[in-house]
């Protein structure tokens, strides 16, 4: 691989039409230090960072040209706290321009330096995409995923109650060792933390990822057609997986869209009247 600091930054290639009508995708780093087995980034052996001064200079040029919506595609934006804080400080100094910023964040890494900064941003000007993937520690261990759930809870509480950050959390259905009951528990636990969106994704077999090492022990069966989605596992039957596909569809339509807030209130009230008081199982049965 070439030295990342020798790569010419490409942001001058954005046209004025791009800047006026599209998201501006940017990156300050490439690679990921984590080894989550379902993710293509697990194949990258290192994290490389662009020259920060040059990067910030390019961001200034984009702002001067009228860019207002920035989506960072760094796999782990808050990996380096000094870099993360410098970039946040830069955009905070221009926040009066009505900027919107999107970052992918590690859920259990939110030290005071970052907390103090994001509290200063206006409501809705930042979105954090936070990968949880599973709430079950054993399942997380199966796929080499690390989450400090105590810190995750603390950080979500902070984001929901002390900042205006919009939070988008991810869960994956079909991970090796996770049944529907375990997923339901994790979904309900996550929902109680108050993220603005929960994306329920279905596991996909990405070429070259080590998730395939579990195929035999957990009887993982994937579709032979793109996007190579999981069809069943030892713990989730084909019928259950189809129900989870419907669950994900209706959850996205009703909850994540934000278009059915009154309906969501009614569903929440209905869930509280059940013995389990589970929002997951209430929507699961409604989507059958």
Which residues make up each language-model segment?
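A structural motif corresponding to the C-terminal lobe/cap of the Radical SAM core domain
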Residues: 81, 93-109, 113-277
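Intrinsically disordered, low-complexity segments used for protein-protein interactions
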Residues: 32, 234, 241-243, 284, ...
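Terminal or standalone catalytic/regulatory effector modules within metabolic enzymes
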Residues: 274-288
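Short acidic (Asp/Glu) and glycine-rich catalytic loops that position anionic groups and cofactors
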Residues: 35-38, 64-69, 220-228, 259-263, ...
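Radical SAM [4Fe-4S] cluster-binding motif and immediate context
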Residues: 8-161
């Amino acid at each position: 691989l070439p030295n990342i600091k020798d790569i010419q930054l490409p942001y001058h290639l954005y046209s004025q039409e791009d800047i006026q009508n599209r998201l501006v995708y940017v990156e300050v780093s490439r690679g990921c230090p984590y080894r989550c087995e379902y993710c293509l980034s697990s194949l990258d052996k290192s994290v490389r960072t662009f020259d920060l001064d040059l990067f910030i200079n390019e961001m200034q040029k984009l702002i001067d040209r009228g860019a207002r919506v920035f989506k960072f595609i760094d796999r782990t934006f808050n990996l380096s706290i000094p870099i993360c804080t410098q970039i946040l400080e830069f955009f905070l100094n221009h926040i009066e321009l009505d900027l919107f910023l999107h970052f992918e964040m590690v859920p259990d890494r939110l030290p005071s330096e970052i907390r103090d900064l994001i509290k200063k941003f206006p409501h809705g000007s930042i979105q954090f995409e936070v990968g949880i993937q599973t709430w079950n520690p054993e399942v997380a261990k199966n796929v080499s995923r690390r989450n400090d759930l105590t810190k995750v809870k603390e950080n979500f509480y902070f984001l929901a109650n002390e900042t205006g950050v919009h939070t988008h959390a991810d869960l994956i259905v079909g991970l090796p060792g996770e049944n529907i009951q375990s997923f339901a528990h994790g979904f309900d636990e996550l929902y109680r933390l108050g993220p603005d969106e929960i994306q329920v994704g279905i596991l996909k077999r990405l070429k070259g990822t080590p998730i395939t090492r579990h195929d035999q022990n957990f009887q993982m069966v994937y579709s032979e057609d793109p996007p190579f989605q999981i069809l069943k596992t030892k713990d989730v039957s084909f019928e259950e997986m189809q129900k989870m596909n419907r669950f994900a569809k209706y959850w996205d339509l009703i909850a994540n869209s934000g278009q059915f807030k009154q309906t969501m209130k009614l569903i929440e009230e209905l869930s509280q009247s059940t013995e389990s008081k589970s929002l997951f199982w209430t929507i699961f049965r409604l989507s059958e």
